């Protein structure tokens, strides 16, 4: 399970060190893909394969489904962390997420998100006040 907030630095070669506590879950490889809110999602390979299988069952006659599948496939990069736990983010991913040297990696239960630190701060400022209301609506009767 991926939980917590971490603040690694992006180096000049586009490498980001993943938090040590997540590395064992990512040993089999990982998939970096474009996500909502101009962030990047990092899935363990097996988790991403399940997501891709579910997504591929969408109707190809639906233009929105086709667009989603195209963007999912084209915007995904397979990575294997090096011995220091670093992954290299593509120039396209760095541009999409507007990543600077200061990044934030957050656990999102079954995957990670990579944000530019300022973008994450701005997102938190905008959405923190609505956390209680959003959790009531999103979780409903679950908790």
UniProtKB/Swiss-Prot annotation:
GO MF annotation, one: transcription cis-regulatory region binding
Whether Cell membrane counts among this entry's keywords is no
Gene Ontology cellular component annotations, sorted alphabetically = cytoplasm; nucleoid
Q: Extract the signal peptide range.
A: none
Q: Which residues form the SpoVT-AbrB domain?
A: 5-47, 76-119
Q: Which CDD domains match?
A: MraZ_C (cd16321), MraZ_N (cd16320)
Q: Which GO biological process entries does UniProt record here?
A: negative regulation of DNA-templated transcription initiation
Localization (cell) = Cytoplasm, Nucleoid
Q: InterPro entries from the entry?
A: MraZ (IPR003444), MraZ_C (IPR035644), MraZ_dom (IPR020603), MraZ_N (IPR035642), MraZ_sf (IPR038619), SpoVT-AbrB_dom (IPR007159), SpoVT-AbrB_sf (IPR037914)
Keywords annotated in UniProt: Cytoplasm, DNA-binding, Repeat, Transcription, Transcription regulation
Transmembrane feature ranges: none
Its chief place of residence is cytoplasm
Q: How does it assemble?
A: Forms oligomers.
Against NCBIfam families, the record matches this protein to: division/cell wall cluster transcriptional repressor MraZ (TIGR00242)
Q: Which family does it belong to?
A: Belongs to the MraZ family.
The name of this protein is Transcriptional regulator MraZ
Gene that produces this protein: mraZ
């Amino acid at each position: 399970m991926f939980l917590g907030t971490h603040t690694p630095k992006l180096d000049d070669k586009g490498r980001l060190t993943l938090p040590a506590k997540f590395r064992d879950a990512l040993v089999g490889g990982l998939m970096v893909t474009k996500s909502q809110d101009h962030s990047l999602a990092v899935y363990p390979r097996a988790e991403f394969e399940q997501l891709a299988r579910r997504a591929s069952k969408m109707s190809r006659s639906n233009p929105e489904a086709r667009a989603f599948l195209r963007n999912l496939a084209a915007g995904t990069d397979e990575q294997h962390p090096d011995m220091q736990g670093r992954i290299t983010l593509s120039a396209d991913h760095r541009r999409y997420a507007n990543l600077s040297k200061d990044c934030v990696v957050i656990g999102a239960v079954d995957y990670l998100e990579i944000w530019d630190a300022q973008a994450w701060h701005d997102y938190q400022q905008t959405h923190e006040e609505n956390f209680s209301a959003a959790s009531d609506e999103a979780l409903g009767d679950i908790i």
